[in-house]
């Protein structure tokens, strides 16, 4: 199952929300009405910020047979302290890309109007208080050089499931960077091999 918020944010006039279980559960409810779906082999995979949303949903939705977070993420505001917030604030007017990511895109996606509300809203995107509720086999990716993968190891260590795997992707093998975009075939090979073994496909 592949879910995302990109188009819905633009055409659906909705906003980014952390409670992704309220999105995934109705989708699984529907999937289970389809006779071609194997009810015991539903997989939830999250890419990019989906590496937060998929684990969040899996903490509440226990009909998922396997979980993939690419890359694994942790609490969005975990690295934010007063010094970091002040530094970001001072850079917003001189760093065009940072301004685009936070002010133009971030404010819009979260439906906020100021930096304080942006950081407050981002603090709702966290897994530390619910990660212990994830029950299914889980694969976490950790691509070298991916700026949003800094929480992958924390997520992996906090998981309390017997079948968990942390998969590294390196610049040397051409699979570093955000979501292994230049080596998705290698990503697919490693993930599908794990799924085949985990779910006896």
Please place each PLM-identified region on the residue numbering.
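Catalytic active-site module of serine/aspartate enzymes centered on a nucleophile-bearing elbow/loop
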Residues: 180-201
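Alpha/beta-hydrolase active-site loop
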Residues: 14-37, 56
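Mobile cap/lid helix-loop segments that gate and shape the active-site cleft of serine hydrolases
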Residues: 84-130
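Short glycine-enriched nucleophile-adjacent loop
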Residues: 45, 51-62, 67-69
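Alpha/beta-hydrolase fold nucleophile elbow
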Residues: 36-48
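Catalytic histidine neighborhood in serine/cysteine hydrolases
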Residues: 159-177
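Conserved alpha/beta-hydrolase "acid-adjacent" motif
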Residues: 146-152
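Short beta-strand/loop motif that positions the catalytic acidic residue
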Residues: 134-135, 140-142
């Amino acid at each position: 199952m592949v879910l995302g918020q990109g188009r819905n944010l633009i055409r659906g006039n909705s906003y980014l929300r952390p409670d992704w279980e309220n999105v995934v559960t109705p989708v699984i409810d529907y999937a289970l009405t389809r006779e071609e779906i194997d009810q015991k082999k539903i997989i939830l995979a999250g890419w990019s910020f989906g590496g937060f949303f998929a684990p969040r949903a899996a903490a509440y939705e226990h009909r998922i047979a396997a979980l993939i977070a690419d890359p694994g993420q942790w609490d969005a505001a975990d690295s934010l302290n007063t010094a970091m917030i002040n530094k970001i604030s001072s850079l917003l007017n001189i760093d065009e890309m940072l301004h685009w990511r936070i002010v133009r895109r971030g404010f819009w996606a979260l439906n906020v109007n100021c930096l304080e509300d942006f950081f407050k809203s981002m603090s709702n995107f966290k897994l530390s208080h619910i990660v212990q509720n994830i029950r299914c086999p889980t694969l976490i990716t950790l691509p070298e050089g991916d700026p949003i993968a800094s929480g992958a190891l924390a997520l992996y260590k906090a998981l309390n499931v017997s079948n968990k795997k942390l998969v590294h992707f390196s610049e040397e093998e051409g699979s570093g960077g955000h979501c292994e975009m230049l080596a998705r075939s290698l990503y697919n090979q490693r993930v599908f091999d794990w799924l085949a073994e985990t779910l006896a496909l």
